[in-house]
């Protein structure tokens, strides 16, 4: 762990003046939002190594415990953003857990306090979230760790997460929706799935756009039923989604929380997210053609149900 190299002068991070919206990470409207998101997600896609996976599991477990402590009332999106910070930190720094077995917990606490400030949530007391622990970190140590997290993130605290892509996929595939209430239900269910599946370390292997598409497809299989028969093909055929990664992400999601869409056969595009930078100007017309094709595809087996809460976890989260 690089704690010995931390900044000598601790900068106390205050809450942001404006609440950070995970579904709209930009501070000002973007002229071409999908191109901006795809450009930014490359800087916000963590990749947790096998060596760091144990530390990640411990940090995720601590965040989950805090999230479901009824007395603390931590918002699910605060926990989501906190674990995103953990992933992004671990993708750039190492924790010497053998020498400092408490390091993952300190990282989790610091990421929780940072996320609460970004979300303008009620202040999270470091003492409260450490209640019942064998030993407690003091405020100075937590603030030093906050500073190290911010340095690792290069102060890009407005994370681009899968939640930022949900609205785009829905508007691109359904520019003139006939069932807005059902689409709202699909989005709400996709958000729930993303919050619950996030602690699965394999989810960090997928870009935010792919994770968002997979969650929407899984949600469509649960919520929409026969009312939107072309939804699976419409999302899967977006020209900037890698079909193989989409399938793999769906499998991870199915294994993690018991929900899985049967839409793999509909994922016909092999282009990568980067391709959209050359296509985004025609994305609207392309999505309309995709929706027409998708409406003709009868996905009769796309209604696998979620089998309940996840088995062992439940954390339910671009700068200029």
Curated annotation (Swiss-Prot):
What does the record list as coiled-coil region(s)? none
Q: Which GO terms describe its biological process?
A: cell division; G1/S transition of mitotic cell cycle
Arranged from A to Z, the UniProt key words for this protein are: Cell cycle, Cell division, Cyclin
A Pfam family of this chain: Cyclin_N
The signal sequence is none
InterPro entries per the UniProt record, alphabetical: Cyclin, Cyclin-like_dom, Cyclin-like_sf, Cyclin_N
Keyword tRNA processing part of the UniProt annotation:
no
A GO molecular function term, named singly, is:
cyclin-dependent protein serine/threonine kinase regulator activity
UniProt keyword Cell division, yes or no:
yes
User: Which top-level group of life is the source organism from?
Assistant: Eukaryota
Which residue ranges does the record annotate as region Disordered? 279-320
Gene Ontology cellular component list: cyclin-dependent protein kinase holoenzyme complex; cytoplasm; nucleus
The entry's family comment says: Belongs to the cyclin family. Cyclin D subfamily.
Name of protein: Cyclin-D6-1
């Amino acid at each position: 762990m690089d704690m010995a190299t931390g900044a000598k002068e601790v900068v106390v991070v205050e809450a942001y003046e404006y609440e950070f919206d995970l579904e709209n990470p930009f501070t000002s409207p973007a002229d071409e939002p999908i191109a901006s998101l795809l450009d930014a997600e490359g800087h916000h896609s963590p990749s947790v190594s096998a060596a760091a996976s144990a530390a990640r599991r411990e940090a995720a477990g601590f965040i989950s415990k805090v999230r479901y402590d009824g007395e603390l009332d931590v918002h699910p999106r605060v926990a989501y953003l906190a674990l995103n910070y953990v992933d992004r930190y671990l993708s750039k720094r190492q924790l010497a857990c053998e020498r400092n077995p408490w390091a993952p917990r300190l990282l989790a606490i610091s990421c929780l306090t940072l996320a609460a400030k970004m979300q303008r949530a009620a202040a999270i007391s470091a003492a409260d979230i450490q209640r019942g622990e064998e030993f407690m970190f003091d405020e100075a140590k937590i603030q030093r760790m906050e500073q190290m997290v911010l340095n690792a993130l290069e102060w890009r605290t407005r994370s681009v997460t899968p939640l930022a892509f949900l609205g785009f996929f829905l508007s691109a595939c359904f520019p003139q929706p006939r069932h807005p209430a059902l689409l709202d239900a699909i989005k709400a269910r996709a958000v729930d799935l993303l919050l619950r599946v996030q602690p699965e370390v394999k989810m960090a292997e997928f870009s935010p756009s792919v994770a968002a598409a997979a969650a929407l497809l899984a949600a469509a299989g649960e919520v929409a039923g026969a009312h939107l028969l072309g939804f699976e093909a419409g999302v899967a055929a977006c020209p900037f989604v890698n079909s193989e990664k989409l399938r793999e992400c769906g499998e991870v999601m199915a294994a993690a929380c018991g929900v899985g869409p049967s839409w793999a056969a509909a994922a016909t595009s092999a282009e990568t997210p980067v391709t959209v930078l050359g296509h985004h100007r025609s994305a609207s017309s392309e999505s309309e053609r995709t929706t027409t094709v998708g409406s003709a595809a009868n996905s009769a087996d796309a209604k696998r149900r979620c089998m309940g809460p996840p088995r062992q976890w439940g954390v339910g989260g671009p700068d200029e």
